[in-house]
Amino acid sequence: MSVLLEVKDLKVSYGSIMAVKGLSLTVNQGEIVTLIGSNGAGKSTTLRTISGLLKPISGSIVFDGQEIAGKAGHEIVAKGLCQSPEGRRIFPRMSVRENLDLGAFLRNDKVAIEADRERVLDLFPKLRERYEQKGGTMSGGEQQMLAVARALMGAPKLLLLDEPSMGLAPVLVDMIFETIIKIREQGITILLIEQNASAALDVADRAYVLESGLIKMSGVASDLAKDEAVTKAYLGG
């Protein structure tokens, strides 16, 4: 199994606060890997740095054989790494169709774009029903579907998902995680950050536990789900 993403000794700060303190992780082609930890552990900071929204102090981020640390976000998207950000962040005054168009803004392969549009609308049938509806008028669950669908329109090799179940009703949480599995079945590798550690460990192949900007544990997700320390800290055990 080939390594698609390799992060080594990543350090990231917000002003004088060191948010990520030497993090290393790998994501192999075809995997779902989850990064779990409490609020403020540095999970979203890690994803934002990988996707080019933040610049690291030091460290290496190699994606698909190329160093991307410190590169602009649009350059990273063009290489096939796309993020669905925390809090959905769709364009509320634009329709579903227009949001999806923006997801593909760096692409010029029109036939492939239309094929991907049909694929994401099949994945999220509600978006087909709401195709010309403005994003801001949709429910939270529908907006989350749109945020993920927009990221998929970038034709990612690696999809970064930041808290996809945040604020959703339990039935929608189940639907989102079922969809994550379907996305992987389409050949897309996934790095997932999720406050719902139990659900994340259920769908992931491997997991990393992040505390105060440092990786404290890592391993096969199903093994970590049974670990006493993980159970007590993150699974309500």
Q: Residue ranges of each PLM-predicted region?
A:
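Glycine-rich phosphate-binding loops of nucleotide-dependent enzymes
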Residues: 2-237
